[in-house]
Amino acid sequence: VASTDTPSVLTDGIRVGSNSELVIEESEIRLPHLRGIRVGGNGSIAVRDSDLHTYGIFMDETVHTITDAKTLKKLEITDSTVLTGDIIGARGEYSSVEEIVIRGSSIRLNDEYTYNRCTIGGGEQASFGSIDIQDSQIDITSSLNAPIGSGLRSSTDRESRIRIANSQVSVRNLKFGPAIGSGYTSHGGRMDIIIENSTVTAKGGSLRSDSDYIPGIGKNASGCKTVIGIQILNSTVDSFRLEEKDGTNYVYDDLHTKELPGIPAENISICGSTVNGTRIDHTFD
């Protein structure tokens, strides 16, 4: 499928309504600039054995109060290649996604969309239940929203879980938030981040002040009230932060010493892994 639509803000790529199931199997789809694959509230999306060039794969529902919030039930990407420019998950205020499952797939940011936010998880004020990435390659960049995790100003009382297993991941946040974890000024709930048998590079975003501290994995210590737990097993992880406001020099954060501001040391477990160049072989606390 190759779309040749004349670009217009009023034109969608592929879209189905609320309470719908969208399934793409054994397909090659090329959508032009700003065309995405969308489903309405309470729907689900499955992509299997396909090659997609799209401006996001998501539920797009914006409401004005949390009581009217919409949910994407499940997004599955299996044995597929995705070149994207926007969110994979839930997009829109107060929207959420229950489950994202990525298996045997490659997801990377389209270089044409350098100004956009590519997030696996939730968009602005959006939350998620679980993100499970296995046997995959991820290479994306976002801003304000965590590239893997929750969106800007996410508010929730739920427990969320990110699991990265047997995968290669390189993610960068350009502004104010971590690359894996909780989006800028998010609050409420608990988020557990589990990395096993994987190679991960995560770069935190720019600082609002010289006293700010934004790690590659976790949360912005000065603007996020979400409880964070981190477990790393049999992996190589490089987690970076910017050294100063308006700076460009990345340094290792303090994940390897369990001294991330706002995250108690007892919430961080590392075993059989090399974290920030330091080998840590002891068992979990």
Positions of the model-derived regions?
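Surface-exposed loop/turn motifs in large extracellular/passenger domains
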Residues: V1-H33, R38-S143, I148-F176, I180-R241, ...
